[in-house]
Amino acid sequence: MPVRSVLVAIPLLVAGLVGVAAPAQAAPAPLTCQGQGVDQTAVLHHEAETFIKAPLRTVWQVQTDVMGWPAWQRAVSSMRKLDPGPLRPGSRFRWTTPAPATTSTPATTLVVTSTVQNVARDRCVRWMGPAIGPGLRIDRGTHVWNFTPARGGVVVRTEESWTGQQIESDPATAIKYLAPGLDLWLADLKKAAEAR
């Protein structure tokens, strides 16, 4: 299954703009980890998923071994764990990622400080924190990952929300980076896990 992206707000926005009721169908349940999800009130959030042909323990290990991210994830320049041991509620890690110039912000490097909020081994993980760089600030990103065993591999679903005055002032530009960023992360995770 190729990487599939769903911009959650578009169907609601389109239905609201044209004044037509959306067809009756069950909306996909928001992603959660131990009952907690992204900020559903955030202007910016995006969901994506992929199928990975690898054992669940392999996919989980690749994704949750944050010190290994720079080796397989193109968008991660550096990583530092701020707490020893495996990911658990309260553990923190700091990583950097390049952010290209936009019409309203310069090219910069974001320093992301993530704090794990929820984790259930081989099932889900949720973290949140700010991403700050010269000329660009995301006050709080919230990121949820779900791992579901499937025939021949694992379905990985992820959802992320961003909040902050600067990025909310230009959501059309911000979503151009949030959406492809998640798709790239999933593609890199798929490649790394399937190669093991």
Where are these regions (language model features)?
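Secretory targeting and sorting signals
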Residues: 1-26
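Sec-exported extracytoplasmic/periplasmic mature domains
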Residues: 61-74, 98, 121, 187-194
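Extracytoplasmic/secreted proteins, especially bacterial periplasmic and envelope-associated proteins
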Residues: 51, 58-61, 71, 111, ...
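Hydrophobic ligand-binding cavity/cleft-lining segments
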Residues: 24-83
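Hydrophobic pocket/interface hotspot
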Residues: 58-63, 69, 93, 116, ...
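Intrinsic-disorder/low-complexity, polar/charged segments enriched in Ser/Thr/Lys/Arg/Asp/Glu/Gln
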Residues: 43-51, 92, 111, 124, ...
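Beta-strand/loop substructures that line and gate deep hydrophobic ligand-binding cavities in soluble
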Residues: 128-180, 184
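Glycine-rich portal/gate segments that line the openings of hydrophobic small-molecule binding cavities
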Residues: 81-135, 191-196
